[in-house]
Amino acid sequence: MLDTMRWTGDGLLELLDQTRLPFEKSYIKCTEYTDVAEAIKRLAVRGAPAIGAAAAYGLVLAARKIRANTKKEFLTELEARARELAATRPTAVNLHWALNRMLRKMRLAEPEDAGLLCDLLLEEAQAIFREDITGNRRMARYGLELIPEGARILTHCNAGALATAGYGTALGLVRAAHEAGRRVSVYAGETRPLLQGARLTAWEMLQEGIPVTLITDSMAGYLLAKGKADLVVVGADRIAANGDVANKIGTYSLAVLAREHKIPFYVAAPVSTIDLSLASGEEIPIEERDSSEVTHLAGRPVAPEGVNVWNPAFDVTPARLITAIITDRGIVKPPYDENLRKTVEGLNRNLVIELTAEDGKSNL
């Protein structure tokens, strides 16, 4: 599997350009934090854990260009850059979690020298990257108990190695089951409008030798009606305190279909995706993207010019439709309002700075 991102050691961050997959494998060379911000905005790097790790490295690039006489001045400039990075994607909470973790490291740091502070920032970014991979593998081990022998798994969008620092969340469970010899197979919904399921999930599964069948999003109901899938597993971009889950648009529809056809609907996400500051999914800011993503396909128009378009990137699945949430600290089952809070107890979640979305809603 290709690296989602790699730090070269000489102030260069390389990001796999996922807009070009599966037909071209190329990396974007980022030497400025603005390069990282642009890559996140245009979905060259995507997936909540991946953009969190990328933004952490982006803040390192920003710090290296700051010229300040005091630590206070350094922090002021760094916080401004963090706000810019946070504004790139308002829904995925991992982005804001990672940036606040980086800023907290600076607030608690003893050195006053900018060079030493930059070294500490790099160490923290690398820790975020490493911890995501180990956390994903741990999550997969927990989730294995929910994946039976021969399971036919329906998934949506891409929550694999490409969406993380490595291994994956929802697809990490699939990968672990495959490695355990459970003969699993995958149905990948294409995931309009940007086709992450067709372009990325199908490609990942083929690379791993895991049987995969591609379907259009509108086929999911009939697939379940015909009894061709045993369970649904998806990732998450933000989980509210009551267990409501924001994920790629179309996830809610799958949850409703899974309930109708009485099959389990699982969410796999690290605890950094849980946002206890939001009581329910109604408070989650939902990103809306450009109409051209819907009216054009591969750069060619597929709709009449001038048609009105609504293009939310995410939807919210109510907690009542979710069978269990698989995290890197264990499996969480209802009642979610109690058990999610217990799951994140002991984690340092205190804000250093409030990173606010463009619509004015707090993202943490």
Curated annotation (Swiss-Prot):
Q: Where is this site: Transition state stabilizer?
A: 157
Q: Which residues form the active site?
A: 237
Query: A Gene Ontology MF term for this entry?
Result: S-methyl-5-thioribose-1-phosphate isomerase activity
Q: Which domain of life is it from?
A: Bacteria
Per the record, what are the reactions this protein catalyses? Answer: 5-(methylsulfanyl)-alpha-D-ribose 1-phosphate = 5-(methylsulfanyl)-D-ribulose 1-phosphate
> Could you say which residues bind substrate here?
46-48, 89, 196, 247-248
Entry keyword annotation includes Isomerase: yes
Q: Which GO terms describe its biological process?
A: L-methionine salvage from methylthioadenosine
| Organism of derivation | Pelotomaculum thermopropionicum (strain DSM 13744 / JCM 10971 / SI)
Family, according to the entry, reads as follows: Belongs to the eIF-2B alpha/beta/delta subunits family. MtnA subfamily.
- Enzyme Commission number(s): 5.3.1.23
Q: What's this protein's name?
A: Methylthioribose-1-phosphate isomerase
Per its database record, what is this protein's job?
Catalyzes the interconversion of methylthioribose-1-phosphate (MTR-1-P) into methylthioribulose-1-phosphate (MTRu-1-P).
**Pfam families, alphabetized:** IF-2B
What are the protein's UniProt keywords? Amino-acid biosynthesis, Isomerase, Methionine biosynthesis
Extract the NCBIfam families matched here. Answer: eIF-2B_rel, PRK05720.1, salvage_mtnA
Q: What InterPro entries would the database entry show?
A: IF-2B-related, IF-M1Pi, IF_2B-like_C, Initiation_fac_2B_a/b/d, M1Pi_N, NagB/RpiA_transferase-like
| HAMAP family named in the record | Salvage_MtnA (MF_01678)
Pathway named in the protein's UniProt entry: Amino-acid biosynthesis; L-methionine biosynthesis via salvage pathway; L-methionine from S-methyl-5-thio-alpha-D-ribose 1-phosphate: step 1/6
